[in-house]
Amino acid sequence: MLQTKNFDMDNYIRIYEDVLDKQMCENIIHKFETSPHQHESFSEHFANVSFVQIDLGKHTEWEKEVKHIHNLLLKSVAQYANDCNIKKNIWPLDFTYESVRVKRYLPNNQDQFGLHVDVTNLTNAKRFLSFFIYLDDNEEGQTIFPYFENSPIMDEFVSPCKRGNILIFPPMWPWAHAGAKPIRRPKYIVGGYLHYK
């Protein structure tokens, strides 16, 4: 009979606090809300997906924010690699970024991003790391990893929506995750991926 063993392994999910300051978070939200001509709406009811986003790479007026995000991301990713004990011969020597997006989820009992993974085909298989930066405090709308435990009494790992925090994790199938519905106020995040080059 085939026997199985469970191994304790790092989940490679990390949260770093206060990487983006309050003023920059508020500025990005304000710019998002005053740029409705740049909004792209996404809605797939069968997949529990509904949100509005701006793809910052499509609009030159966001260059300053993108540069700032990339700079802080470099520091956070270096900390992540160190904290996860990722050796240099394992980490990509050179990488690039997928276009950064700002997403808004309204407290309308509809906006959310259902359970999914970020690498699903050959085209997006160049992604090797995912990140979200939370732009506002929100007691709901957290990011949920249902297959990772973070305490003896829970069967999932939950990243709360706390302004300025960055969540970093691998984008492949073991890291299936969901963005829960916000309840009382909109949820804003900056999201993107690191790519193999």
Spans of model-derived segments:
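Fe(II)/2-oxoglutarate oxygenase catalytic core
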Residues: 1-166, 172-197
